[in-house]
């Protein structure tokens, strides 16, 4: 499943039905059995996620870029079509700027058990008792779990986040380094200022430089399944 977290207001619901149908049609054209959950805002994740059968999940957001909301809506369809065309296997990457509400963590854990390959959890703005449970679920089901933290958290919170849970605690910069040392090329997709999908095959240090340059707005991330083990060991 691809979960698309939409920042649009309820006023755009009349567009969402058409959007939903279009995405379903794209999936069918490529012979994919994909269930799509359309959420109007991150606050609605808990409503949609638990009832969805998750296979592979990518949470997608767009930076503002001054584009009209309806243009972004259709830009996402183009991105989805591009994902299907290249046969990409999507990872769950929770972008730090769309951190979900506390109540959604159990649902995310449940989704990971059903097929996601890895998870990157940005350190939450507020520690809570549910997050260790989620991390334990990821580890128990042999999924790779990375906890990406701001550098300022390392001195005070590393032990809390990682203690006894088998997860890897690293800064966002360190995550970029891990990706950049992969020997195989990976493809990173991102929306340009017009909202269109572009794919760049990068290798070696180029990946690190690219991620570093786009770190402030790179909210769409896609890695090929065959490269997951190499980049997340």
Curated annotation (Swiss-Prot):
Induction (UniProt): Expressed in the late phase of the viral replicative cycle.
Keywords: Late protein
Annotated family: Belongs to the asfivirus H233R family.
Protein name in UniProt: Uncharacterized protein H233R
């Amino acid at each position: 499943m691809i979960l698309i977290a939409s920042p649009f207001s309820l006023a755009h619901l009349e567009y969402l039905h058409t959007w939903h149908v279009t995405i379903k049609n794209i999936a069918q054209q490529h012979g994919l059995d994909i269930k799509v959950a359309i959420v109007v805002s991150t606050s609605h994740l808990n409503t949609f996620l638990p009832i969805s059968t998750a296979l592979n999940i990518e949470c997608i957001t767009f930076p503002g870029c001054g584009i009209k909301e309806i243009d972004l809506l259709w830009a996402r369809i183009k991105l989805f079509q591009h994902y299907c065309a290249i046969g990409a296997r999507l990872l769950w990457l929770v972008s730090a700027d769309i951190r979900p509400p506390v109540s959604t963590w159990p649902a995310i854990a449940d989704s990971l058990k059903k097929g996601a390959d890895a998870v990157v959890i940005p350190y939450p703005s507020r520690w809570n008792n549910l997050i260790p449970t989620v991390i334990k679920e990821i580890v128990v089901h042999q999924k790779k779990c990375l906890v990406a933290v701001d550098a300022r958290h390392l001195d005070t919170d590393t032990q809390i986040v990682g203690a006894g849970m088998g997860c890897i605690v690293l800064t966002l910069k360190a995550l970029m380094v891990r990706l950049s040392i992969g020997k195989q090329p990976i493809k990173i997709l991102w929306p340009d200022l017009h909202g269109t999908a572009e794919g760049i095959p990068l290798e070696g240090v180029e990946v690190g430089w690219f991620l570093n340059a786009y770190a402030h707005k790179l909210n769409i991330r896609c890695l090929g399944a065959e490269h997951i083990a190499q980049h997340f060991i």
